[in-house]
UniProtKB/Swiss-Prot annotation:
Binding site for substrate: 106-109, 196, 262
Subcellular location: Cytoplasm
Record's catalysed reaction(s): beta-D-fructose 1,6-bisphosphate + H2O = beta-D-fructose 6-phosphate + phosphate
Signal peptide (from-to): none
Protein name: Fructose-1,6-bisphosphatase class 1
PANTHER family reported in the protein's UniProt record: FRUCTOSE-1,6-BISPHOSPHATASE-RELATED, SEDOHEPTULOSE-1,7-BISPHOSPHATASE, CHLOROPLASTIC
Quaternary data: Homotetramer.
Length: 330
């Protein structure tokens, strides 16, 4: 089996980008170690701090964020970074070539129940001139690399550099990421969906109708039965989609009118959308292709619908209908 370093060489990924990817991978090994130790190391539980999103930070949110910051500062190729746990962008190296956006511990609410968590990252080219938040506001099409590390029964790295999606598994004895799937591919059709059903009453009419039709199964307009899955960590739900197909969605809702969207564009939706597209799937907000969005702020949130291409198209078809006669959700 190829190691991650050997794979990057075989794909002719340039030296500086390869170095950055290896730094991210090496840091994820240390994060995996911290996650595995859990309560034994006293790293579980919440702090009294909130991040810029107003979410209570877990101890491991802060620990993993600092681990990635320190590693990227030492790497030498990174101009600046943006993190879910940082209010503002962080300048790293004046002559760095890349910008890195990341969610250091996606699904951290799962950590206290020993369920799936992961790290999501996106690599963008660093523009010339002074580093500001605007430097990061590039569409997802500009991503040079994207991936996630899933900390589960095995620690796995899913990676794209624009040449498909490869999956690596961390060998527990050698501590090397080894290539275990050279070409992840999402089947175009599916009978599996992932959504937080507890928010159903807050969704827009198109999503309410779409999910209602899925639940009708063979007796409904879709004429086939669907299974529902929900891990409560985007990294886990998207990994399942990449592994066996499906559709994952976190749609617009009015549960909190000030926050109609849940997932962050720059370090959640964009990297996952690139992975999904590179594996043959589609990713949309319901009204716009995610990778075509022009960001307006670092912590911008968006609705997300991604996965098997034909099923995403089916979902999007509901968003083009007239729901003027439907009861209001207000």
């Amino acid at each position: 089996m190829q190691t991650l370093a050997q794979h990057l060489t075989s794909k002719a990924v340039n030296e500086s980008l390869s170095q950055l990817i290896l730094t991210l991978a090496d840091t994820s090994k240390a994060i995996s170690h911290a996650v595995r130790h859990g309560a034994l190391a006293g790293v579980l539980g919440a702090t009294e701090q909130e991040n810029v999103q107003g979410e209570t930070q877990k101890k491991l949110d802060i620990i993993t964020n600092d681990m990635l910051k320190d590693a990227l500062k030492a790497d030498g190729t990174v101009r600046g970074l943006a993190s879910e746990e940082e209010d503002h962008v962080v300048e790293v190296c004046a002559n760095g070539q890349y910008l890195v956006c990341f969610d250091p511990l996606d699904g951290s609410s799962n950590i206290d129940i020993n369920s799936l968590v992961g790290t999501i990252f996106s690599v963008l080219p660093a523009p010339q001139g002074e580093l500001t938040e605007t430097s990061f506001l590039q569409s997802g099409r500009n991503q040079l690399a994207a991936g996630y590390v899933l900390y589960g029964p095995s620690t796995m790295l899913a990676l794209t550099t624009g040449q498909g999606v490869q999956l690596f598994t961390l060998h527990p004895e050698t501590n090397e990421f080894l290539l275990t799937n050279a070409a992840m591919s999402i089947s175009p059709d599916t009978q599996e969906f992932a959504i937080n059903m507890s928010n159903q009453r807050f969704w827009e009419a198109p999503m309410q109708t779409y999910i209602a039709d899925l639940l009708l199964g063979k007796i409904g307009p879709r004429e086939k039965s669907f299974n529902m899955r929900w891990i409560a960590a985007m990294v886990g739900d998207v990994h399942r989609v990449l592994s066996r197909g499906g559709i994952f969605t976190y749609p617009t809702d009015n549960k909190d009118p000030k926050k109609p969207y849940k997932l962050r564009l720059m370090y959640e939706a964009n990297p996952m959308a690139l992975l999904v597209e590179q594996a043959g799937g589609k990713a949309s907000t319901g009204y716009e292709t995610i990778l075509d969005i022009q960001p307006t702020q670092i912590h911008q949130r968006v609705a997300v619908i991604l996965g098997s291409a034909n099923e995403v198209d089916a979902c999007l078809s509901y968003h083009g209908l007239d729901y003027s006669e439907e009861p209001s959700l207000d």
